[in-house]
């Protein structure tokens, strides 16, 4: 379409290795005959002859040609072709069609993920950001949204073509098994969830923060910050935690997780003047912890803190947020 003029091809090797490399046996043939009888009522002699000849051969006589996985290809070009390699086995091509066409899913996810990478790369350049952070600026929390373990592995692996950040363990396993991927395949950080924060009680949220910081004294740690009241945490809560955050050898990443992401992060113009809601997360944290100035004159938050937003995100919304950040004089590297 007008927006996606090319596709990033990915996923073929998984289907070839998982489904088409196993030797074809008599057991496979009998299973096929059984399903044929169930669905169509009988197995014609010509079908039985074809399948028996395939069992005798023992493998799929097919040649699959494809562009290199990970390649971006202009739309309306062939991504792969399948032909038979032995006379009389022309019909095998049609038998694997449905299986191999499932690369539409992995290719679609890889393409979408690549568009996000290109978006963050462009805004990083425009705002003087940190290129080394880009592989972590789009993080895969999609495991729970997938319909199966296989879907999670394949979709998550497609994301890893472009980024390193993931919480989808099956994707890391699949990348190693089917693509011989070398470390680092996918990375993440210690992070809290709402149940953890609730376990300290309504008035124990600061204690929950301190507990997370104590258990993770170094490196990056992400803490969900809207369990009760995001704005309380970012104002009075941060005042209580400020010295501990600054003294820590690492970065505390605040995670808002509800509301309109654009307004939460960049400020709600409808909120009362001077209110935390009007300022938004970035401006509050900039005032509390200070900023550095990038080569383009944009503001980059103190390296001791960061912001991640993982709810209700999609390309157009992310694009709007990055544009608003630019208009506010904020560097794109402030956001994961």
Which residues make up each language-model segment?
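N-terminal active-site wall of soluble small-molecule enzyme domains
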Residues: 43-49
């Amino acid at each position: 379409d007008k927006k996606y003029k090319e596709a990033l091809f990915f996923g073929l090797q998984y289907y070839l290795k998982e489904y088409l490399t196993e030797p074809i046996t008599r057991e496979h043939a009998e299973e096929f005959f059984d399903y044929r009888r169930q669905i169509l009522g009988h197995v014609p002699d010509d079908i039985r002859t074809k399948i028996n000849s395939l069992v005798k051969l023992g493998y799929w006589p097919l040649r699959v040609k494809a562009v290199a996985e990970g390649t971006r290809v202009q739309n309306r070009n062939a991504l792969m072709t399948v032909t038979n390699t032995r006379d009389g086995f022309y019909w095998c091509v049609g038998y694997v069609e449905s299986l191999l066409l499932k690369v539409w899913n992995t290719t679609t996810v890889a393409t979408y993920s690549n568009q996000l990478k290109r978006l963050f790369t462009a805004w990083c350049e425009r705002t003087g950001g940190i290129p080394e952070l880009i592989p972590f600026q789009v993080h895969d929390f999609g495991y729970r949204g997938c319909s199966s373990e296989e879907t999670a592995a394949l979709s998550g692996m497609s994301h890893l073509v472009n980024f390193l950040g993931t919480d989808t363990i099956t994707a890391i396993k699949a990348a190693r098994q089917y693509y011989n991927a070398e470390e680092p395949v996918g990375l993440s950080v210690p992070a809290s969830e709402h149940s953890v924060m609730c376990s300290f009680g309504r008035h124990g949220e600061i204690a929950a923060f301190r507990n997370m910081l104590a258990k993770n004294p170094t490196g990056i740690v992400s803490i969900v910050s809207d369990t009760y009241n995001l704005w309380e945490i970012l104002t009075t809560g941060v005042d209580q935690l400020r010295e501990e955050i600054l003294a820590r050898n690492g970065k505390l990443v605040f995670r808002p997780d509800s509301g309109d992401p654009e307004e939460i992060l960049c400020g709600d113009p409808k909120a009362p003047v001077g209110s935390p809601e009007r300022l938004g997360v970035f401006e509050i944290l900039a005032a509390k912890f200070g900023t550095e100035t990038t080569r383009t004159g944009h503001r980059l938050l103190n390296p001791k803190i960061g912001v991640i937003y993982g709810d209700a995100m999609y390309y157009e919304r992310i694009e709007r947020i990055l544009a608003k950040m630019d208009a506010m004089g904020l560097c794109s590297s402030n956001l994961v």
